[in-house]
Design a protein with these regions (language model features):
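Basic- and hydrophobic-enriched, low-structure N-terminal and domain-boundary segments
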Residues: 1-152, 156-159, 196, 202-204, ...
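P-loop NTPase motor domains
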Residues: 14, 22-29, 140-453, 468, ...
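Short alpha-helical interface patches
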Residues: 49, 54-56, 64-118, 238-248, ...
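General secondary-structure edge motif
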Residues: 99-101, 126, 142-143, 330, ...
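Conserved long hydrophobic alpha-helices within structured protein cores
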Residues: 115-121, 396-403, 497
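Conserved ATP-driven motor cores of ASCE-family P-loop NTPases powering translocation/secretion/packaging/pilus
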Residues: 445-547
Length: 609
């Protein structure tokens, strides 16, 4: 079948030359009809007989005539082939570049017809939350990179409008704690539950059904206004212990010299041993950082007595006698290979790294867990991570929380839900550069998409990301299908953005005037390549404008989203101070039970009420 189609195509392409060749057989017939003893006489006679030969539209089938037709048709085909082969390639109007701004038609395939099911990007552009659209080529991940200098509206023009969509679970980094205060009541109210037709669902009484959010908060500015977060509660295996230790070391400082790999590895051994013992052997109520601190405080080392055993040594000796292949024992034995002086230095470094846990409030807030990080993909939840934008002393807790969050949700998606969480989880990481390093983030952003998780990094400059993640920063940026520039003047960001936008071809003309005995004028037209927006133009971009780049689509120069136009704006504290969320009242109204607290449970029958 394929061969027949190829022959048909070949015949169609060469049909004009075949017809011309058949018509040219008449010239062969005219030559044969011409009278003359030699070629010159035949040429003179050809003029007389040619009109008669051409009167017939039917080709001559005489062998000589067919040869003439074949030569004429073949010669023309050869001439056309040679001309096309050597032809110059012109791209009129695109000689120096084809860059242009995107239009409504460019973004249309990526927008969901139901407004609430979109990620808001700009005033006129949005991206569907559907990770499996009808046309697979329009599928894009929901990772977003937002770059904007101080005061460019990263929170007001982008983060808050997306929080108002209320189509997913949210993890929001909240510098200063203002986002929770302004949007908390809106989330408590929730959004109407939408049916398959995109319309709000109603109960049997005709009332609209709302889906209120569970609200969780970790406040590192004021621990009295925070729920409890215990990283130990999410340890389920030996690899979880190593992940926790890696995050702790990456975001805290010890006493070893910067970049000294020995001290880092030695501390890792000790932390793994102690946390392993706490996880596998200690009661649930003692599985926290307070117990870890007590262990380190009890580890006395005597440089002049290598045989001395402190209480922790005795505990591990007893564990080894009972379980010689225990994970904690194997790690502790490696740590004990260090000589007395070295071991003392390791303990000093550990003490310095965990010095913040000498603060009673921090020990109390990490005593047990209320955040339930592994349930964020089960039902709509909003987790606010409040951190200081001036003091990074406790930001390691935020980084630790994100690390455990990503790992827990990915594992739950794979083990429980067949690879995809029932509720999409969006991480809106404002002031991303201030929370510290999330280990293996470059790998996480590449793999979380398929689990219905997305990460949105909000930065003041692109160089901030490179300062933290070094060479991996480009990999992280490459896995962000969407990037938005809200304005700024950081040179590296402007240079890279101008290069990515590309060049367009413009028309220019030059005028000249020469004076002498006679005055003459000249006018010269030419084409040049110009950057779609140069660095200086980006630096002075209008404060109400932003630049959107979506993978595979032309860039957009658009207006920033007007938060007051959102349907849910009226439920926020920005619209009415009465909508302000009271964190203290919210936390005090909740029943909080500690792990060792005893209470009575009653079952109430409301059927007869």
């Amino acid at each position: 079948m394929k061969k027949t189609l190829d022959i048909k195509k070949l015949v169609l392409l060469n049909m004009p030359y075949i017809l011309l060749g058949l018509f040219a057989t008449n010239f062969g017939e005219a030559w044969r009809m011409a009278q003359g003893a030699d070629a010159s006489e035949k040429f003179l006679s050809l003029v007389a007989v040619l009109p008669g030969a051409l009167q017939s539209f039917w080709p001559s089938l005489h062998p000589l005539d067919l040869l003439v037709g074949l030569c004429c048709g073949g010669s023309l085909r050869l001439a056309v082939y040679l001309k096309s082969k050597n032809a110059k390639k012109y791209r009129h109007g695109l000689e120096y570049g084809s860059a242009r701004w995107g239009t409504r038609e460019d973004i249309a395939p990526y927008v969901d017809p139901v407004f609430q099911n979109n990620v808001i990007l700009t005033k006129t552009e949005s991206l569907t939350m559907n990770s499996r659209p009808k046309d697979p080529k329009t599928a894009r991940n929901k990772n977003v990179l937002v770059i904007g200098g101080s005061g460019s509206g990263k929170t007001r023009f982008w983060l808050k409008p997306n929080l108002m969509q209320m189509h997913s679970s949210y993890v929001v980094t909240d510098p200063k704690g203002t986002i929770l205060v302004e949007c908390g009541k809106m989330l408590q109210r929730g959004a109407p539950k939408l049916g398959k037709d995109g319309k709000p669902m109603k109960d049997k009484h005709g009332k609209v059904i709302y889906e209120p959010y569970r609200i969780k908060v970790l406040n590192t500015i004021n621990f009295k206004k925070s729920m409890h977060y215990n990283p130990f509660a999410y340890i389920h295996s030996e690899k979880d212990i190593l992940k926790l230790v890696t995050t702790l070391i990456a975001n805290t400082k010890g006493e070893g010299k910067a970049g000294d790999d020995f001290w880092v590895k030695a501390e890792t051994l000790l932390y793994c041993a102690l946390i392993g013992y706490i996880h596998y052997e200690a009661p649930v109520e003692e599985q926290n950082f307070s117990t870890l601190i007590e262990f380190i405080n009890a580890m006395e080392v005597r440089e002049d007595d290598e045989e001395f055993k402190n209480p922790v040594d005795l505990m591990f000796d007893a564990l080894e006698a009972e379980k010689p292949n225990h994970f904690a024992v194997r790690q502790y034995k490696k740590y004990k290979l260090a000589a007395g002086k070295t071991a003392k230095s390791i303990l000093i470094s550990c003490g310095a790294r965990l010095a913040v846990f000498d603060i009673a409030e921090l020990r109390e807030v990490t005593a047990y867990d209320e955040l339930e990080l592994d349930t964020l993909g089960d039902q709509k939840t909003a987790l606010f991570l409040i951190m200081s934008d001036t003091d990074d002393s406790f930001n390691f807790l935020i980084s630790m929380c994100y690390t455990q969050l990503f790992n827990l949700l990915c594992e739950k998606a794979d083990d429980v839900y067949g690879g995809r969480l029932p509720v999409h989880v969006r991480c809106l990481i404002d002031e991303c550069a201030n929370i510290g390093q999330i280990p293996k983030l470059e790998k996480l952003v590449a793999t979380i998409r398929s689990r219905e998780i997305s990460a949105c990094l909000v930065l003041q400059a692109q160089s901030q990301l490179k300062a933290i993640y070094k060479d991996n920063a480009d990999t992280i940026i490459g896995n962000m299908d969407t990037s938005i520039f809200l304005g700024g003047k950081e040179p590296t960001t402007l240079k890279e953005l101008a290069a990515v936008l590309g060049k367009e071809t413009i028309d220019t003309y030059n005028t000249g005037e020469s004076r002498g005995r006679e005055t003459s004028h000249s006018l010269n037209y030419q084409k040049l390549g110009k950057e779609l927006m140069s660095q200086d133009e980006l630096a002075v971009m209008d404060g109400g404008k932003c630049i959107l780049q979506l993978r595979g689509v032309r860039p957009f120069l658009s207006d920033k989203y007007d938060i007051t136009k959102h349907p849910n704006f009226k439920y926020t504290a920005d619209a009415d101070d009465k909508n302000a969320f009271d964190i203290e009242a919210f936390l005090s109204a909740r029943l909080k039970l500690k792990p060792n607290e005893v209470c009575d449970v009653y079952e109430v029958d409301t059927k007869g009420a």
